[in-house]
Amino acid sequence: MRNIEVPAGVIDYDETGSGPPVVLLHGLLMDHTLWDRVLPLLPEGFRYLRPVLPLGAHRHAMNPGADLTLPGQVRLVADLLDALSLEGVTLVHSDWGGALFLTARGRDRRVARQVILPSEAFGNFPPGLPGKMLALAARLPGGVRLAARQLRVSWLRRLPFMYGQMAHRPVPGELIRRWTEPVLTSPGIRRDLVAYCRGRFDKAALTRDTEALAGFHGDVLVLWSPDNRVMPAAHGHRLAALMPRAGYAEIPGAYVLSMLDEPAAVAHKMGEFLTSTPAATEPGQGQHRP
């Protein structure tokens, strides 16, 4: 793992390959290993970067006073792309939808293309039953640690309010242990996660920020899982309709974490998109234009 400093703190990231950059994101209580099954199946000729965002499975607590609410996390992603001096980025969203708001914030200059797997969007923050349960746990004393310990019990994490609605296939225990270790052992990591979960989620403002994607002019693949119950199927179609150069495809049978349920299908669709649409040849290709 490499790391780089941004104003909020130190961010770890994994990097492999060379060529136009592809940045693969993740959701709460997950890290870069979410993409382990897909990464070897993606086409060569690209530089794949997998940052570990401060969403609960990170290894370095952020700086005291860092803004880790949703707006702060959006800035952090933009700051990370700046710190890495990336141009013509293909940004891949999964589960956490915060980085969709780079356009609304005027911080998408480095983003040329996007791939949007089932993610929070419009007013669906926190998403579905699992998201609302984690938000509730973050407001209770000791709630985050209790939730993390429960996730380590295989039959409990298959319940709908845990991972039962996130992945169709059982999530391996070794992944769960890795993802929950930081919040179980580090008060600083718990503080960071709680700071995000206790932030304000204004559904009207979130919907407006999502709709700002109409100003994104790069190529987009919305790769939705219509069988999931957490990110509405209608949101996938709505996202694709928003952006002038967006296409829509589906991964049947998968839930939110389609890269775990159907890694070969996800890699195939992503690979087709990466190799059939040109990466940006100059900075700002995907930038919001008035």
Residues covered by each model-derived region:
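Alpha/beta-hydrolase fold catalytic core
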Residues: 1-22, 43-47, 82, 86-87, ...
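Conserved HGGG/HGGXW glycine-rich cap/lid loop of the alpha/beta-hydrolase fold
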Residues: 14-60
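Active-site loop/oxyanion-hole signature of alpha/beta-hydrolase fold enzymes
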Residues: 16, 49-96, 268
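Conserved alpha/beta-hydrolase catalytic His-Asp/Glu region
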Residues: 125-128, 151-215
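Acidic catalytic loop of the alpha/beta-hydrolase fold
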Residues: 227-231
